[in-house]
């Protein structure tokens, strides 16, 4: 039997190109499983094969635990240390037992286990082989085509899957076609595919530029981000680490040669190369190209920008089906609101009027005084109440410290009165504490929800985004986040 084990291990190792150690591990597992079947109760068996002679020893073992739940497999620490004081929790007590003689059933079990272990070893080998290739472009031959995906043969018994959503629109492949894509995921636990390739994600565009533009590989040019509408249009942001190099020109190439190669690989996808800037507003202006931006207003609190363009330039700025502004939003990470110059002026005039009326009513000011505060950029009572006094006295018309002190006192009193009114409104509406404590919720929004008869988490979870869009303080995205947070708690039990 020992000679048969050695011959079998050598044959399988050579056939599968796997280390002999892996084959012996599979054989040990197979013999252990066959041995367990000889017992009428649950046991833990370990088998050790001598790789030189093929002889094997069999051990029955007990796990050292605090509390025994399976007496046939576990032993307490106190009992284990009776024979070996050095044993610790998590270690094993072993007794050598008689090794089984292989009969037909035992041999069949061994073959099944060996086959499973070999498949696992082969899959582990593929994962190890391609782990360092993750994030890079790989090339394979189409092996199988289905409605939802294709399977690529990458060589050396390695296969990768490209899902339909990771292909370009209208992209069709046949068995035998050569395909390039980015290996974006290596999944060691995958039961079917372990390697996943994409042609539609931004990483594909980035890696193609790394290949076609040597200055990127030499780190003279840096890619700062990319956004794609796969197969149609893309934007990629670049910056130069060498003042002598024009990053946009280098990426375009002589007569557009470099970017054209990338466009051809991506089925005609048009690529805008955007100059990155550490000034967010300038970066957004660059990202909106080819549209000309007339003016831009940054809202740091909401991480958004209002972009104004001339009326005859609006369609180009937005793009077909919103494509240009959508890609610019993805590339920059800012929420971008595109409108005409007239619309922007009207919007901000309305906002100024709202703030003006707030100051007039809450602070009991005349319109002229309130207008001074608005023109100086104050937009809330909190800003007036807690800004350093010297900043207010530096404003023309507000040099008097007593006047400024009175102004700040009125602002603080107005804030306190508003807070008390909010608390009374919430108490009267019987708003649930869980709703008030929801992430992203504030008392003002809670009052607006209460006016809509939404006073509990369950009631909020039942709403749609359209039901909350008339609340001025909420954007559609913020409304969606609140609703989803409520659903996660009420429907899925995620506290």
Swiss-Prot record:
Protein name: Transcription termination/antitermination protein NusA
Keyword Lipoprotein tagged: no
Gene designation: nusA
Pfam families linked to this entry: HHH_5, KH_5, NusA_N, S1
Molecular functions per Gene Ontology: DNA-binding transcription factor activity; nucleotide binding; RNA binding
Subunit structure: Monomer. Binds directly to the core enzyme of the DNA-dependent RNA polymerase and to nascent RNA.
NCBIfam families (UniProt xref): NusA, nusA_Cterm_rpt
GO cellular component term of the entry, any: cytosol
């Amino acid at each position: 039997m020992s000679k048969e084990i050695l011959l079998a291990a050598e044959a399988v190792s050579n056939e599968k190109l796997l280390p002999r150690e892996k084959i012996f591990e599979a054989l040990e597992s197979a013999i252990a499983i066959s041995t367990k079947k000889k017992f009428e109760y649950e046991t833990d068996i370990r088998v050790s094969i001598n790789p030189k002679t093929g002889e094997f020893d069999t051990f029955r073992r007990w796990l050292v635990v605090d509390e025994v739940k399976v007496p046939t497999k576990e032993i307490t620490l106190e009992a284990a240390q009776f024979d070996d004081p050095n044993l610790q929790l998590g270690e094993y007590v072993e007794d050598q037992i008689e090794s089984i003689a292989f009969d037909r059933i035992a041999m069949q079990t061994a073959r099944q286990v060996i086959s499973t272990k070999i498949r696992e070893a082969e899959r582990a080998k593929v994962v190890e082989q391609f782990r360092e290739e993750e994030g890079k472009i790989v090339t394979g031959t189409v092996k199988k085509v289905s409605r939802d995906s294709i399977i690529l043969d990458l060589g050396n018994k390695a296969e990768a899957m490209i899902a339909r959503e990771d292909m370009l629109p209208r992209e069709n492949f046949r068995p035998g076609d050569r395909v390039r894509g980015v290996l974006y995921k290596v999944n060691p636990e995958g039961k079917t595919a372990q390697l996943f390739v994409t042609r539609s994600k931004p990483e594909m565009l980035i890696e193609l530029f790394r290949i076609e533009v040597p200055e990127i590989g030499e780190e003279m040019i840096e890619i700062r981000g990319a956004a794609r509408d796969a197969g149609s249009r893309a934007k990629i942001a670049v910056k130069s680490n060498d003042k002598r190099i024009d990053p946009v020109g280098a990426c375009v190439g002589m007569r557009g040669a470099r970017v054209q190669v990338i466009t051809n690989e991506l089925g005609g996808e048009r690529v805008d190369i955007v100059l990155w800037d550490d000034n967010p507003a300038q970066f957004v202006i660059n990202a909106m190209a080819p549209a000309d931006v007339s003016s831009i207003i940054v809202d740091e609190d909401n991480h958004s920008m209002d972009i104004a363009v001339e009326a005859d330039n609006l369609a180009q700025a937005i793009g077909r089906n919103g494509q240009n502004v959508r890609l610019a939003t993805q590339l920059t990470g800012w929420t971008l609101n595109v409108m005409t110059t007239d619309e922007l002026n009207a919007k901000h005039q309305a906002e100024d009027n709202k703030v003006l009326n707030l100051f007039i009513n809450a602070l009991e000011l005349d319109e002229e005084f309130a207008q001074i505060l608005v023109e100086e950029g104050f937009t809330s009572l909190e800003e007036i109440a807690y800004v350093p006094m010297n900043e207010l006295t530096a404003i023309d018309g507000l040099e008097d410290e007593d006047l400024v002190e009175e102004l700040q006192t009125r602002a603080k009193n107005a804030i306190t009165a508003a807070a008390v009114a909010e608390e009374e409104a919430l108490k009267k509406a019987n708003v649930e504490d869980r709703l008030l404590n929801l992430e992203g919720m504030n008392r003002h929004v809670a009052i607006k929800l209460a006016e809509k008869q939404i006073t509990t988490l369950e009631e909020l979870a039942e709403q749609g985004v359209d039901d909350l869009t008339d609340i001025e303080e909420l954007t559609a995205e913020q409304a969606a986040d609140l609703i989803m947070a409520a659903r996660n708690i009420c429907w899925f039990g995620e506290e």
